[in-house]
Amino acid sequence: MRSHATGPDPKYFLQSGPFSITNILSRAALEIQDPELHILGIDPFKRVSKKNLLLLGLLYKCKIILTNLVAKWLLLHMVGPTIGGISINYIALPVECFWNALVIRRVVKEARLRLFGFALCNHVADHVLEEGILHGLSESAKIGALRAIGNAVVLARNYHPNMIVLLLRWQHLLHLHKDHQYDDWDLFLEALRTVSTKERWFLLNLFTIAAAFDGRISHIEAVSMKDAYGPDYALYLPRLLKLTADLHAGRINAAAALCKIDFTAG
């Protein structure tokens, strides 16, 4: 399902819509693809070849079949058509069990990541409101904030709900509903160059949190971080890696401590 939403109602999306905590966890448990919602014009697959996406999907579907075939071929040539009177055709059962165990483990970890991400989105939003951080932001910095999250979504190259929930919360906090090319990388870099020093640190803090929220760092993210962080690369990269690792490992308290957003560097 593909849907376009230029100005979605964040309250609906987070409480009863596709990115409510119930629906987020249900999709993780059932391994259902997250909905393709181009919220505020942001296209997560902007830098992804559609042919590569199709190829990766086919490879993923074929891996269990290939594993069964390889296992049967090896057993047939090493021990013959039967093992203890049992046909090697039944070898598919333990292979299926092995893959199912891996899938269950991955699903549990992903569900935990989504649950913690949802909680941390609320934690970050509450902190920003309590500290009154948004009051002194320029219009360029406000738009830059959504570009920070929007470009993190593009760099991650998926519709991970943690990032979408973060985007919706910040859209609601900033009261921005028009499309300002939030997934344009060059405009985000320009904002980092033109806003004040403190606002730049604010944007980098938010960008770091958004980039870590799917619990992994892709190659394209690692390369792009140098352009975004600039002279502060050595300061922000360790925080990004630590936050990503804490989220992936389920260390929510450690992750929460790294989710600070203010006007200081690092």
Predicted features along the sequence, with ranges:
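Small-residue-enriched hydrophobic alpha-helices in membranes
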Residues: 3-266
